[in-house]
């Protein structure tokens, strides 16, 4: 059992869109928990205050049973294990997922995807429904900036998760001097298409200086270029993230272009998806829309 079993740094009821999940139970709330530390060494970490810290000598303890009780009391429809890398709390997560499944709550991970196939199989068997995987860059960038990490293991997680029925969305924090070059972005977009499918959403999100990295914030034109690259690669759904109100934060039908989901920040202003289809042309819209 891990030493941080049940050690909690943060608890919050969040819109599922904040994870971000845009094609998984939109408009619902996920009761979200984080612990401490990380298995990556990214110098730009946006959650560095918990991911780069060891747990206190006496951390707050939340049992899986209490977490499920808090989830239901918050009015949330599901759980999310996030904020820091959830696989560091594997045993606790497995206990939470099993309890949540019995209570008809959905289960999500926000993860860097660096886990063994055996760990992912345990998670899916326990009730993991969805993962947002942080794809930090191409192989060169990830190895250089994330302390020797092999990005192929992250792609393997995406493929295995998809094959086991897990809903997958992928996020790339677009960072100047790290992964903002056209070649890097195109390689990610093309790998999404080839490895997990063109219908998997890709979130290209704005970076802001944090922790030990002082590159300037992501220019808007870079994010919009990333969006175009994703579409050119054949992705059906590409989103510009961390820019509330941007037109590319909305969902459009890949068949006819109809605006299907209009977002205002993390709120859903309109959702026209019906039975997983566009009401205008009948084209399927990949996702979990229950």
Give the role of each language-model region.
Residues 1-130:
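Conserved Radical SAM active-site core
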Residues 72-99, 142-155, 172-187, 193-194:
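Conserved glycine-rich "GG(E/T)P / GGGxP" loop and the immediately following alpha-helix
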Residues 74, 126, 164, 195-197, ...:
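Structural motif
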């Amino acid at each position: 059992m891990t030493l941080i079993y049940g050690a909690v740094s943060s608890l919050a009821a969040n819109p599922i869109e904040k994870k971000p999940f845009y094609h998984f139970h939109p408009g619902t709330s996920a009761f979200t928990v984080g612990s401490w530390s990380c298995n990556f060494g990214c110098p730009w970490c946006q959650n560095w205050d918990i991911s780069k810290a060891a747990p206190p000598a006496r951390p707050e303890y939340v049992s899986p049973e209490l977490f499920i009780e808090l989830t239901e009391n918050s009015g949330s429809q599901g759980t999310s294990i996030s904020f820091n890398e959830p696989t560091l709390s594997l045993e606790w997560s497995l206990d939470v997922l099993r309890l949540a499944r019995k209570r008809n709550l959905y289960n999500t991970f926000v993860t860097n995807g660096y886990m063994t196939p055996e760990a992912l199989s345990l998670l899916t068997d326990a009730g993991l429904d969805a993962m947002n995987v942080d794809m930090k860059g191409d192989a060169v960038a990830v190895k250089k900036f994330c302390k020797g990490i092999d990005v192929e293991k992250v792609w393997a997680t995406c493929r295995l998760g998809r094959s086991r029925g897990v809903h997958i969305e992928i996020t790339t924090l677009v960072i100047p001097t790290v992964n903002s070059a056209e070649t890097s972005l195109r390689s990610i977009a093309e790998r999404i298409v080839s490895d997990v499918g063109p219908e998997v959403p890709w979130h290209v999100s704005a970076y802001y200086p944090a922790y030990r990295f002082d590159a300037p914030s992501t220019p808007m034109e870079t994010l919009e270029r990333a969006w175009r690259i994703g579409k050119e690669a054949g992705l059906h759904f590409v989103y510009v993230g961390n820019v509330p109100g941007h037109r590319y934060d909305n969902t459009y039908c890949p068949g006819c272009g109809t605006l299907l989901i209009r977002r205002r920040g993390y709120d859903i202003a309109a959702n026209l998806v019906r039975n997983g289809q566009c009401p205008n042309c009948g084209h399927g819209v990949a996702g979990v829309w229950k």
